[in-house]
Amino acid sequence: MKIKEIIVVEGKDDTVAIKRAVDADTIETNGSAIGDHVIEQVKLALQKRGVIIFTDPDYPGERIRKIISDKVPGCKHAFLPKEEALAKRKKGVGIEHASNESIRRALENIHEEMEAYTSEISWSDLVDAGLVGGEMAKSRRERMGKLLKIGYTNAKQLHKRLQMFQVSKESFAEAYKQVIQEERK
């Protein structure tokens, strides 16, 4: 599988994992202290070939994704479910621990940022679905993020991603229905 866009990852081990799974070029941020030279590389890559941000499904990875998204709007995003990024001995989370199949699947389901889009899904829809507050909220958001392939987030970030990736009310309702069915099992 050849990827046209340049993939932004956190480090060398992620690059090795990406290249093991697909034919692609990467830019490494080397941690969350992203220098101006990395931002310039990402801007140039976006102009020339497009960019996919593919960071670890953990707090530092999400922080890096947000920094790059804010400074270089228009990037695409790939998300890896946390359970597919766990190290063998459960010590650590990262793309470098994912299988080739998981990496390919994440890159087949990329999302594009859309600016100035008003979501069909309101904050009260999230509250009504039990995705904000309450004992089941976190697990429901985890499941929704996985089903919609937008990654796990807190409630505020979930609302933002639903808008950014223009998730339709139908897709949201379908995923929610599936979450509720799974809870009843």
From Swiss-Prot:
It catalyses: Endonucleolytic cleavage of RNA, removing 21 and 42 nucleotides, respectively, from the 5'- and 3'-termini of a 5S-rRNA precursor. GO terms for biological process: rRNA processing. InterPro entries: RNase_M5 (IPR004466), RNase_M5_C (IPR025156), TOPRIM_dom (IPR006171), TOPRIM_RNase_M5-like (IPR034141). The keyword Cell cycle does not apply. It is found in: Cytoplasm. Mg(2+) 1 binds at residues 10, 56. Keywords: Cytoplasm, Endonuclease, Hydrolase, Magnesium, Metal-binding, Nuclease, Ribosome biogenesis, RNA-binding, rRNA processing, rRNA-binding. One of its GO terms (molecular function) is ribonuclease M5 activity. Transmembrane segments: none annotated. Mg(2+) 2 binds at residues 56, 58. Gene3D superfamilies: 3.40.1360.10. Residues 4-87 form the Toprim domain. Its cofactor is Mg(2+). Binds two Mg(2+) per subunit. Pfam families: DUF4093, Toprim. Its EC number is 3.1.26.8. It is an enzyme of class 3 (hydrolase). GO terms for cellular component: cytoplasm. Belongs to the ribonuclease M5 family. Required for correct processing of both the 5' and 3' ends of 5S rRNA precursor. Cleaves both sides of a double-stranded region yielding mature 5S rRNA in one step. This is Ribonuclease M5. It comes from Bacillus anthracis. The lineage of its organism: Bacteria, Bacillati, Bacillota, Bacilli, Bacillales. The gene is rnmV.
